[in-house]
Amino acid sequence: MNNSVTSNGTHEFVCEAWLGSSSGGLLRGDDPLKYSTPLLLLLISLVSSLSSVFQALLRPLANVDFVTQILAGIFLGPSALGQNIDLVKKLFNTRSYFIIESFEAISFMFISYISTAQVDMGVIKRGGKLAIINGLSLFLFPYVVGAIACTVITSNIRGTVAKNNPEQLHNLLTNQSVVYFQVAYSVLSNLKMLNSEPGRLALSSIMVANCFGWGFFLLLITFDSFLHQNYSKTTYLPTFTKVLLLVGIVVVCRPIFNWIVKRTPEGKKLKASHLCTICVMLCTATFLSETVGFPYVVGSVALGLVTPKTPPFGTGLTDKIGSFCYAVLMPCYVIGIGNKVDFFSFNLRDIISLEFLIFTISAAKFASIVLPSLYFQVPISHAVIVGFIVCIQGIYDVQIFKQLLNYKNISHEAFGIMVISAMVHSTIFTAIVKNLYGWVQRKHITYRRQTVQHYEPNKPLKILTCFYHRETVPPILTVLELSTCPSSASSHSIVSVNLEELEQNNVPLLIQHHPGHNDESSTSSSRRDQISKAFEKFRSGHDLQENVSVECFTAVAPSKTMHEDVCALAFEKETDLIIFGMADGTAAERRLCRNVRNASPSSVAVLMDQGRLPDFKNMGTAMKNGSMRINICSIFLGGADDRETLAFAVRMTNQPYVNLTVLKLVDGENVSHLNDVVEKRLDFRTIEKFRQDTMNKHNVALREVWIKEASDLVNLLREEGNNYDLIMVGIRHEKSFEVLQGLSVWSEIEELGEIGDLLVSRDLKLSASVLAVQQQLSSVVEEV
């Protein structure tokens, strides 16, 4: 027996004979579509196939998953295939309708929980004052502007708008004014903007607006219960049970989550028993939410908020619950939406009226973000991007529209127009955000040379270090120690960025560490503290501590966009050099290194330690007693990268325990291998300046080495490579160099350049550490 509500508000009971869930098959004379399991699988297959087709067609516009899914549902509904009466009788009969409705509710229960559990409420605190002001403005301004627009519409149009009475139009206005952080998170994740400045500001602002919205919603429900009941003890009971439910979710469920975290070893995924426990808690919270008078989604959202944001929940929930939800439950969800959208029920007047209201509210959302952001001096490009992000709608919005329709708070016509409007606006706004953000990224150019070669001596040398593995921290600190000038005439500004890969579907973070302050008592926090303490010890170990400043950050971001935090910090701090520590040349490290090199606003040096560099902690003592010498080699073949390498090597000669040997590679006629006349002239000036600057330094030597082909270079490095502790080389060289011909064919770590890759190759078996340097990529041309 199934129970449904008809259009006139009465209940309709449908009784059907139980045939079983599985068919015996066509060969036995059974009709598979009369059984629930084959019918469900067929509908899922149809939606998945259609979604893939629409995904391919809309790919040039933007990556809007929800649009393609809803389109698939609409295509199966009365707007397209649903016009075929025979098909409707087969696929969308009474039995299938109730199957779809049930799975639709289950789907949204899981979607709302997973999308909420992904987001850390700490984003609000990190957003600062601007996020609070933006959130308050985003909560109030669209509603006020929408109310004015609603008044204009009702006063100028006779009758109803899309069969909505004034109360229904007000419900439409209220829900169009709301922005959901679950939608924003999904969009930012798809566009790989979670760890961008606009992404962080958008997410924190929307979460603040949602906090105001949820608070207002609870007050409204409480006020409504008082308004419609006599003042007695029973009046307070509904309010008390609602509060008790929310408190119970926190008090009961949070300890269970913490128990699961303790029982799950680090790096391991959720056990099946723990996953079942979470599902039971979710179903219980949802059921109790509906029982006490809340919409059922409140229970799943509340449970998502109390779910810890630490592993194993980030990857475990998405990999196990999320995959099933989006692959199996989501198709049923979009079919239920598509069956309620009928293009043939629309008329032009209703479309224009509702679009005017929706567009006005979207414009108010845009203004409520852009104006406060500009007042707080946020770059106009970032403010505009955030403004468009808050206008994007998604699956979450559509489900809220569906709830309004189920409770008769809006008409079928209004629901259809709102769904189509959400799809069109989201496609347009997502495409705008994607292209505008890409343009902003490409505009990350500097208006001065940020290189070691063009460093101004009267200013501090600014170096940003970044590393994916802790093992690379000691050699990086050693290189920093070598480049530090012991005199008081020069100062050093160091920024360290500890890179951590984001647990899937958690919120990206950029954490600044302060001396003596621990953020959390977790394993990851302990590692971060150790790294920040190492850099602080580096600073405190100098006699002239006032000449060395250190800032430590941890960037938690997806691996594909991790470089954006590095480059954004380098741009903000105006660093002259980025030093990237490479441990073993894994694919992830190489991709990250490549992205940093391509997007960096300054010069980049890639350090690959092979064990010869001493520990920086012992260098001070060894320098005083003269027991340590560090031999450095700089290979000069020609070009911008080699000039940058030489400039950095010369700076290291300020340390009395450093011996520098510059190997200038020339052909048989004592001529540079370069063909470019301008580059030759720049190389000549650089070498002449080097000779003048190091004339009185006894720890510097320049040798010109005759090299005609690649085999000569290989023999030179094999014979002399182990004489040095550190070999410095440029990454990029002219492709026409005969001396490098054939080396790139056997390259294993091409991010180090041809010579750098040769130095770390297994063929040479060298123990010297390698520092490969790339000068700043810029359109600025050096004076000839």
From Swiss-Prot:
GO CC aspect terms: membrane
Compartments it resides in: Membrane
Membrane topology: Multi-pass membrane protein
Tissue distribution of the protein: Expressed in pollen.
Keywords, in A-Z order: Antiport, Ion transport, Membrane, Potassium, Potassium transport, Transmembrane, Transmembrane helix, Transport
GO biological process: potassium ion transport; proton transmembrane transport
Membrane-traversing stretches: 38-58, 61-81, 97-117, 130-150, 201-221, 240-260, 286-306, 321-341, 351-371, 376-396, 413-433
GO MF, one example: antiporter activity
InterPro entries, sorted: Cation/H_exchanger_TM, CPA2_transporter, Na+/solute_symporter_sf
Chain's role: May operate as a cation/H(+) antiporter.
PANTHER family tied to this protein: CATION/H + ANTIPORTER, CATION_H(+) ANTIPORTER 26-RELATED
Family affiliation: Belongs to the monovalent cation:proton antiporter 2 (CPA2) transporter (TC 2.A.37) family. CHX (TC 2.A.37.4) subfamily.
Protein's UniProt name: Cation/H(+) antiporter 26
Organism: Arabidopsis thaliana
Gene: CHX26
